[in-house]
Design a protein with these regions (language model features):
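C-terminal catalytic core of Y-nucleophile DNA break-rejoin enzymes
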Residues: 3, 171, 215-235, 241-270, ...
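N-terminal DNA-binding module of tyrosine recombinases/phage integrases
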Residues: 3-94, 244
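Catalytic-site neighborhood detector that most strongly recognizes the C-terminal catalytic loop/helix
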Residues: 8-10, 161, 214-218, 320-345
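N-terminal DNA-binding recognition helix of tyrosine site-specific recombinases/integrases
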Residues: 72, 80-87, 94-109, 113-148, ...
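Basic, Lys/Arg- and aromatic-enriched nucleic-acid-binding interface segment
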Residues: 117, 121-123, 136, 140-192, ...
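C-terminal catalytic core of tyrosine-transesterase DNA break-rejoin enzymes
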Residues: 136, 180-183, 187, 193-194, ...
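DNA/chromatin major-groove-contacting recognition/catalytic segments
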Residues: 169-170, 221-227, 231-236, 330-349
């Protein structure tokens, strides 16, 4: 078995390889192998093999990313690092090499009991990123996260749009902020995290349009405001700070957690109150049940309403936004007039 010795001294490297081969002929765990290698490295080079605890490495990783990435991406890293360390508890202060694929699989399965498959898989990908970076930085011999698979996701095929009667029931069950978020979700077709991220800076009342960059794909969207949304905006308090959020409570939750998971669960509670989910499915079984209706269904509803109104498919795709970040290089191609006609096709709720 070939293994890097992390040294440019050829003689030392050969000695390390020979000693490691000799010491590891018996069955040993990855942790034992790491300790053997550390002892050999110290005896032959007089130096300690580079090590870091999970907490030290993840803290350093986040700090390294701080000047490199957007605030939303940084919040994503911070949130996943914090939750993983919280779950590890005391083990977060042990060497990175002590973490095994079994540990990460257990974390994945724990996460899957309270979140859906997409959120769980997003977590797996984040953890994979942490450990791949740690291996690249020389703190790991093997990457335990690389052996951990994602969970199966069949939720998309079960989703459907809301009916207008169901939307009215949701509006009746929601509080003022959630009613506003439902309106924005329906009339723009954007995802929950993008709606929660909106600030007054995104709204141009002079041109009656909303401008945003989606968190998932980085797509730049400039959309005419439907009449119903224009009317709704006149009832909202803008304040003096253009960077203040349209939906303060949701924005705080998103900023604190880095994901829309808690917001999704809160919306599930609204659906329960509206009689569109059972009480059991809004609890522990939520993550395991493939629901037909969620906040994302507003995106499907917007698509269906536009298609039913005769809006061309290409305009619908531009208005709602492509899923791929590579499509159109982040820009819409439909003209302003076509998008305005699409916006005018929405009914009031």
């Amino acid at each position: 078995m070939k293994r890097s010795t992390k040294t440019t001294d050829k003689k030392l490297a050969q000695k390390l390889a020979d000693r490691f081969e000799e010491e590891s002929r018996g069955k040993r765990t990855a942790t034992q192998a790491r300790r053997i290698l550390s002892d050999i490295y110290r005896s032959l080079s007089g130096e300690e093999l580079p090590t870091m605890t999970v907490r030290e490495y993840l803290t350093a990783f986040v700090n390294r990313k701080r000047p490199e990435v957007a605030p939303a991406t940084l919040a994503y890293y911070e949130g996943h690092a914090r939750r993983f360390m919280g779950w590890l508890d005391a083990k977060a202060d042990t060497d990175l090499a002590e973490i095994t694929a079994k540990d990460i699989t257990a974390y994945r399965n724990h996460h899957a009991t309270t979140a859906g498959p997409r959120t769980t898989n997003n977590t797996v990908k984040a953890i994979r990123g942490f450990f791949a970076a740690a291996k690249k930085d020389g703190y790991l011999i093997d990457d335990p996260a690389a052996a951990v698979d994602t969970v199966r996701d069949r939720s998309e095929s079960n989703r459907r749009p809301f009916t207008l009667d169901e939307l009215r029931a949701v509006m009746a069950a929601a509080d003022e902020e959630w009613r506003s978020m439902v309106r924005f979700g329906l009339y723009t077709g954007q995802r929950l995290s993008d709606i929660a991220s909106l600030t007054w800076q995104n709204i141009d009342t002079a041109r009656n349009e909303i401008r945003l960059t989606t968190r998932k794909t980085g797509r730049r969207q400039t959309l005419p405001l439907p009449a119903a949304l224009q009317s709704h905006l006149t009832t909202m308090q803008a304040g003096d700070d253009p960077k203040s959020p349209l939906h303060p409570r949701a924005a705080r939750i998103l900023e604190k957690t880095g994901t829309a998971t808690k917001l999704s669960l809160a919306f599930a509670g609204i659906l329960e109150s509206a009689g569109l989910r059972t009480a059991a499915s809004a609890g522990a079984d939520h993550a395991r049940t493939r629901h037909e209706l969620s906040f994302h269904s507003l995106r499907h509803t917007a698509t269906s309403l536009l298609k039913d109104a005769g809006v061309p498919q290409s305009v619908v795709m531009d208005y709602i936004g492509h899923d791929s970040p590579d499509v159109s290089h982040g820009y819409t191609h439909s003209g302003r007039e076509a998008l305005e006609k699409a916006a005018a096709a929405f009914p009031a709720i």
